From Swiss-Prot:
Name of the molecule in the record: Phospho-N-acetylmuramoyl-pentapeptide-transferase
First and last residue of the signal peptide: none
Species name: Brachyspira hyodysenteriae (strain ATCC 49526 / WA1)
UniProt keywords, alphabetically: Cell cycle, Cell division, Cell inner membrane, Cell membrane, Cell shape, Cell wall biogenesis/degradation, Magnesium, Membrane, Metal-binding, Peptidoglycan synthesis, Transferase, Transmembrane, Transmembrane helix
Transmembrane segments: 26-46, 73-93, 98-118, 131-151, 182-202, 221-241, 258-278, 283-305, 360-380
Length: 383
């Protein structure tokens, strides 16, 4: 909104020209979301306490988690709220990717809110039946897949050459490719157009990431810390993908409107940092499914929009491992005579059962997350 208001006035005041820069507005989005959470979280936490919106802890989980019973949950409300306000202020509101990201965040947060509310109301950990959560996630995934397959025309492959006469890089080939194309990390010349199959693929990405973050949200600061790390990597990827010169130099697809996605990612980072202040061990508040389902979903959507879907496996490796641990545990239990691969799933509980303290698990997973995020960014040069 600020861009639409102030940038047209740049000739009246030179400072308004700053609003044209993605980096300036991204920094503004980070700061705004961070400040909003820091300012309003204490009041929201007190309100949640008065409403008795406390965490319901599974009785089959680690015994050390029983002390968390009653800790205010649904803190994702002020994460989502601060992101929405920050994006409203700093992003170009006529950018369709921003609109879809915002709508997706709202829809998935509604699903998460219903899940949290039912857990609190009935004082158990069941919440919204899984089929309904999958419905919300699938609905969002299909919308994103349909948009990218049928309507999005923003993906280009560009080749530049040095003009020896003037010593300047010039575009010699600009080729539009379908947004249903997936690009392989480490290989600049290998890409596959999934065509109509991109819709179920996009749906799978959204559903998987939404559930992966949800499953990871079991220790103080774990899910939100990893989200900050992953969002920082996505900010780099979205910025370079939206810059034609950098994208061409790195031999990655140029997404003509991806730069604006960086502003949205900035809001994620700011809100995440603010929430971590209150969610660090011992947590004063939990994000609940209103936060984890929605934030995980938009991480997947961002990767789809900037055409780095497959890099999710690398930069989101901890989330992927957490989700896979649950899938493998259930599969092994059902089909191999009730045998368990892990002491407890998700994976963070396995390490708790192995004697690691909660803070050890969290910080060691952070370290792995940082390493994998750096590897993901490094793939930009290994092509």
């Amino acid at each position: 909104m600020l861009y639409q208001i102030f940038y047209p006035l740049r000739e009246s005041f030179f400072g308004f020209n700053l609003f044209r820069y993605i980096t300036f507005r991204t920094a503004g989005a980070v700061a705004t979301a961070l400040i909003l959470v820091i300012l309003f979280a204490p009041g929201v936490i007190e309100k949640l306490k008065k409403l008795h919106f406390g965490q319901v802890v599974r009785d089959d989980g680690p015994e050390t988690h029983l002390v968390k019973t009653g800790t205010p949950t649904m803190g994702g409300i002020f994460i989502v709220g601060s992101i929405l306000i920050s994006v409203l202020l700093w992003a170009e509101l006529d950018n369709l990717k921003i609109i879809l990201l915002t709508l997706s965040l709202v829809i998935l947060s509604i699903a998460g809110f219903l899940d949290d509310f039912l857990k609190i109301k009935y004082k158990n950990s069941k919440g919204l039946p899984g089929i309904y959560k999958i419905f919300f996630q699938t609905f969002v995934g299909i919308i994103i897949g349909v948009y990218l397959y049928y309507f999005d025309k923003s993906t280009f492959l560009m080749t530049f050459e040095l003009n020896q006469g003037i010593g300047v890089l010039e575009a010699v080939k600009v080729a539009q490719v379908p947004s249903s194309t997936i690009f392989l990390p480490f290989a600049s010349t290998i890409y596959i157009d999934l065509k109509i199959l991109y819709i179920p693929f996009a749906t799978f990405v959204v559903v998987s990431m939404s559930n992966a973050v949800n499953l990871t949200d079991g220790l103080d600061g774990l899910a939100i810390g990893l989200l900050i790390i992953m969002s920082m990597a996505l900010a780099v990827l979205s910025y370079v993908s939206g810059n034609s010169l950098i994208a061409t130099y790195l031999k990655i697809p140029f997404i003509s409107d991806a730069g604006e996605v960086t502003v949205f990612v900035g809001a994620l980072i700011g809100a995440g940092l603010g929430f971590l202040w209150f969610n660090a061990h011992p947590a004063q508040v939990f994000m609940g499914d209103v936060g984890s389902l929605s934030l995980g979903g938009v991480l997947g959507i961002i990767a789809l929009f900037i055409k780095h879907e497959l890099l999710l496996v690398i930069i989101g490796a901890v989330y992927v491992a957490e989700a896979l641990s649950v899938v493998l545990q259930v599969f092994s239990y059902k089909f191999f005579n009730k045998k368990r691969i892990f002491k407890m799933a998700p994976l963070h509980h396995h390490f708790e059962k192995s004697g690691w303290k909660e803070t050890q698990v969290v910080f060691r997973f952070y370290i792995i997350g940082i390493i994998m995020a750096l590897i993901g960014i490094a793939t930009l040069k290994i092509r």
